[in-house]
UniProtKB/Swiss-Prot annotation:
Pfam families the UniProt entry points to: HD, PolyA_pol, PolyA_pol_RNAbd
Ranges for domain HD: 228-329
Protein name: Multifunctional CCA protein
Positions bound to Mg(2+): D21, D23
Species name: Salmonella paratyphi A (strain AKU_12601)
Gene for this chain: cca
Keyword Secreted: no
Amino acid sequence: MKIYLVGGAVRDALLGLPVKDKDWVVVGATPQEMLDAGYQQVGRDFPVFLHPQTHEEYALARTERKSGSGYTGFTCYTAPDVTLEADLQRRDLTINALARDDDGQIIDPYHGRRDLEARLLRHVSPAFGEDPLRVLRVARFAARYAHLSFRIADETLALMREMTAAGELEHLTPERVWKETENALTTRNPQVYFQVLRDCGALRVLFPEIDALFGVPAPAKWHPEIDTGVHTLMTLSMAAMLSPQLDVRFATLCHDLGKGLTPKNLWPRHHGHGPAGVKLVEQLCQRLRVPNDLRDLAKLVAEYHDLIHTFPILQPKTIVKLFDAIDAWRKPQRVEQIALTSEADVRGRTGFEASDYPQGRWLREAWQVAQAVPTKEVVEAGFKGIEIREELTKRRIAAVANWKEKRCPNPAS
């Protein structure tokens, strides 16, 4: 029995990155020998065991053979005669097909170290094409390591295009697509994930609402980058710099979906694209089974982001109604989230990356003012039932009006 550290832990250690999870491969052992050594079996489809002390995963070396469609259509073979090289060959990328033995020696049969040094994401073997989920995984790795200047090897991108064109991605379940997307959205450069999907044709298959934005022009005065798809990825990049929150990043990604519905004869203007985009956000989220809290914020951002940009000319009544509409009284975090997505929208434009966004500050300040109006005083004044809410709204509007006159005057007044 020989045990090797494999995959991501070896890769990240060689890159000088923190190692989070460790995966191990056991060569020359049977399931019974693992159980006798105190390991606990947890794998259902193939033998995976938990270490009795560390609870890290130890998998018996295995090979895989394509036996059906999609990413689940594989038959696994596990036996003591399966070599480490055979186990590593089934992995997706050469940089993930690395192992380290007890003495610290690196086993690298597929030149993963060379590709690490060259900053290349390259597939190990033609078997890559048998698993459509790998298209998304490579896009996610491209996003994860973009800050280290990694790129996808030409032959790997070509294979990803072939897989997409062959309809392989249609076998992916919504849950797996969303899981990879969720992980990609939390990387330092989530926009790279969607750019890679577009480069191989997968964006049109998996995210048609986003793909439809490419080639749709916006007024050059407000959008020097012109293309709405380009703007969308720029705003996502900016959102990633502004916030680590998945909610903020996903909502920013979806903020302009409505522009994909604008008839060509009305280009480059997109009046009413905010409310129009709400249905597309709903459609995308329903198809991929996106969590409800992410969906709800994305719908609000789609509908109201342009309103936030006009904050200086908003009436106090409109501002308080906005807080009602986003349910800020029960979910106050939404004020900050919407301020951030709106800022990402403005700064996600060519030449505007370093722009100040005072509207975000004013939105936050107005919220603090409105929130500070005491409900207790309204109740103690004798108001009852629906009168309490009506009086509270009046007092909030008055408080915001007083604040706005001092801190955020209407430029037209």
